[in-house]
């Protein structure tokens, strides 16, 4: 979004991913005369950020289970968002019942669909608590109380928006394509030349170190960040199309979430048939999970040992938050 809008405006942006109070304040303070501020905001910080910045547009991504010891359940976060969005203009996903419930309270909605199916936490209606009805193989949802999936203003099919605009994305994975599409829609809302915006979006090769390359020993690693079951599902699907060798690095610090029970919500079967190494502060937890899944793997002390084992080859590192940023800044 920042790069798309930068083609027309001067931008203040927390480009390092520092999305809590201090990071937002630092981004605004670093460029106080910017014409537009593009701020990535933590789930719990969103109500505060809306109150303090009075945004012209709030872009809501999907809302999944993440750091339950810090964020609480998805429904609680959705309710907090709903309370904060009164009077706001939002770009929101129609595919996520919790986002729809929150965005329904906004003054104006721009609905976006990537035709995603189902939601691992949405068995019941966020509005009334009754069982949510899922139809069309998970593509649509509705409830007897009247809550339902809204019609989308923008629909992404593959790389094409509304069967008209092909969106550029140089970052692999379905989530990256969806974010590129959202950036395109935001550029349209802010009156940016769409051809210039689309080119700028396509020029983004890595975001805050994600998908950046890091050479350790003789191994060329690609860095992938995964923080919760939803992001692990997406990352594992993306990684499956890449190198056969993969290193998993999982910590459990405050920024990661100290509760690692989420590992049991992740389907690790995409790792089958690959050379898998495991390290990090919670490597034993990960090893236990992979053993139950039947995934062959080895536990190693750190990424240097992993590089010695992998040798001169390409490999992926899939890392939790603190491990990822340590490696990205190494």
Give the ranges of each region predicted by the language model:
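Residue-level signal for inorganic ion chemistry
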Residues: 40, 61, 91, 179, ...
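Short glycine-/acidic-enriched loop or helix-start segments at secondary-structure transitions
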Residues: 23, 48-49, 69-70, 100-103, ...
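Acidic, Mg2+-coordinating active-site environments of NTP-dependent enzymes
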Residues: 64-219, 296
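Active-site flanking residues adjacent to catalytic metal/cofactor-binding acidic residues
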Residues: 39, 92-94, 178, 223, ...
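Generic beta-sheet signal
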Residues: 60-61, 93, 112-114, 249, ...
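Phosphate-binding loop of NTP-binding sites
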Residues: 1-111, 120
């Amino acid at each position: 979004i920042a790069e798309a809008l930068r083609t027309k405006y001067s931008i203040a942006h927390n480009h390092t991913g520092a999305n809590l109070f201090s990071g937002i304040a630092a981004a605004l303070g670093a460029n106080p005369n910017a014409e537009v501020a593009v701020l990535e905001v933590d789930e719990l910080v969103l109500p505060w950020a809306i109150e303090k910045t009075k945004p012209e547009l709030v872009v809501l991504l999907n809302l999944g289970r993440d750091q339950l010891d810090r964020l609480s359940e998805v429904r609680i976060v959705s309710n907090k968002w709903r309370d904060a969005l009164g009077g706001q203009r939002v770009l929101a996903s129609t595919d996520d019942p919790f986002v729809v419930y929150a965005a329904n309270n906004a003054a104006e909605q721009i609905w976006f669909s990537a035709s995603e199916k189902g939601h691992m936490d949405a068995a019941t209606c966020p509005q009334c608590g009754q069982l949510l009805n899922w139809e069309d193989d998970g593509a649509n949802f509705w409830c007897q109380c009247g809550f339902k999936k809204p019609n989308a203003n923008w629909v992404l099919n593959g790389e094409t928006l509304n069967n008209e605009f092909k969106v550029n994305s140089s970052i692999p994975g379905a989530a990256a394509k969806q974010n590129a599409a959202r950036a395109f829609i935001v550029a349209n809302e802010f009156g940016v030349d769409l051809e210039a915006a689309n080119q700028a979006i396509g020029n983004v090769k890595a975001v805050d170190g994600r998908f950046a390359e890091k050479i350790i020993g003789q191994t060329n690693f690609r860095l992938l960040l995964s923080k919760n079951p939803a992001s692990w599902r997406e990352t594992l699907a993306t990684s499956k199309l890449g190198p056969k060798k993969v290193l998993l690095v999982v910590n459990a610090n405050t920024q990661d979430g100290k509760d690692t029970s989420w590992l049991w919500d992740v389907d690790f079967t995409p790792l089958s048939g690959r050379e898998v190494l495991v390290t990090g502060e919670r490597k034993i937890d990960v090893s236990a999970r992979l053993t139950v899944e039947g995934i062959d793997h080895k536990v190693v002390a750190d990424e240097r040992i992993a590089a010695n084992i992998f040798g001169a080859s390409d490999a992926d590192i899939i890392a939790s938050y603190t491990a990822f940023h340590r490696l990205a800044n190494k």
